[in-house]
Amino acid sequence: DAEESGDDDGVDWIASRVTAFVGGGDNGGDALYACAILARGGIGATAYLLKKRCHRRALAAAQEAGVRIIDLGGQSLRSIENTPAWSEVFLAHAWIDGIVGTGAHGPLTGALAESVEVLNRLSAIKPRPVIAIDVPSGLTDDDGAITGTILRATHTLAVGTYKRAQVLPPAVEFSGNISLVTM
């Protein structure tokens, strides 16, 4: 899990308005810390909490840095389409994928799978950088197999070391450009 060190390796190419999609584990925590770093650097950052619980210390750091937090309470992004809360999803110059990471097992289900489907659909209509932390959400870390819905990344930040799912076919097609980030 990322330390709130202020290290900005791998984020210098992100535009001025970033939206993160945050799951309940360390991957979501890393996304919140990334938003905090970006916000402290003057970049507008919004984080959508997709699970009822999230990484509390990272959430506090993001809030302290001025990140806009939108808590969906475990509901899918589909629940906010055509509402004012949808604007930060649609207007963002870049997205950070912190939904699930290497600790996830099996395909995405329920609201998370539905949210990823919504994001993939919107990304096809309005392309933008999609930055995954460790692995794109929905990829398994073990063998690179495609077992369900996966958020297609344009960039993947390999934290600490490269992961097998980032480089093994057919999953490699979902990782985009891969950058090694050391903390």
Cite the ranges covered by each PLM segment:
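Nucleotide and nucleotide-moiety/phosphate-recognizing core
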Residues: 1-101, 105-133
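YjeF_N-associated NAD(P)HX repair module
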Residues: 91-183
